[in-house]
């Protein structure tokens, strides 16, 4: 009998650092250089390994996504799934910037063909092709977004993919 890995392990949400790195990688903006100075800037393209945690600033992205407390020795991180995490993905400027960069990259990769651009975004965000039903839903979302505000609808689709369970969890 075939045993699928999803039968053996439950899906888990990405921790703060891998989630931030995945967002930057999806946009093609992750700086993979090793070494060098750390930074306090969440908007830096450096891997999260190089983002310093200020002990006095516990109201940040990492804390929202269950980062370890730097003031204590902990054997494991607490895991939570709470509304502020979804609100962060919906509203934070970093996610918006990543979605815009992804949309721009998709336009360069498949400039005229909407279906190819949808496929490009799915591959970049989810590492797979969309199903025919997902392609139709994405096409409808693009039409609705274009009618609603008249702007470029592609960042909206990119943002939807970045906010979905499939992006923020690991099977």
Where are these regions (language model features)?
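Amphipathic alpha-helical segments that form the core helices of the histone-fold
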Residues: 136-147
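Globin-like tetrapyrrole-binding proteins
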Residues: 157
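An acidic, gly/pro-interrupted, aromatic-rich
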Residues: 1, 6-125, 129, 161-171
């Amino acid at each position: 009998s075939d045993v699928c890995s999803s039968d053996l392990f439950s899906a888990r949400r990405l921790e703060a650092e891998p989630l931030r790195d995945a967002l930057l990688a999806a946009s093609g903006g992750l700086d993979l250089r090793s070494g060098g100075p750390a930074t306090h800037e969440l908007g830096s393209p450096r891997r999260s390994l190089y983002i310093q945690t200020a002990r006095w600033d516990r109201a940040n992205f990492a804390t929202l996504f269950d980062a370890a407390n730097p003031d204590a020795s902990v054997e494991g991180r607490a895991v939570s799934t709470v509304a502020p995490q979804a609100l962060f993905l919906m509203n934070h400027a970093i996610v918006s910037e990543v979605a815009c960069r992804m949309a721009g990259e998709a336009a360069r990769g498949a400039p005229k063909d909407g279906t190819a651009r949808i496929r490009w975004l799915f591959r970049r965000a989810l590492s797979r092709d969309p199903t025919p039903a997902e392609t139709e839903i994405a096409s409808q979302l693009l039409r609705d977004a274009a009618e609603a505000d008249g702007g470029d609808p592609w960042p909206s689709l990119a943002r939807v993919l970045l906010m979905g369970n499939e992006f923020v969890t690991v099977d």
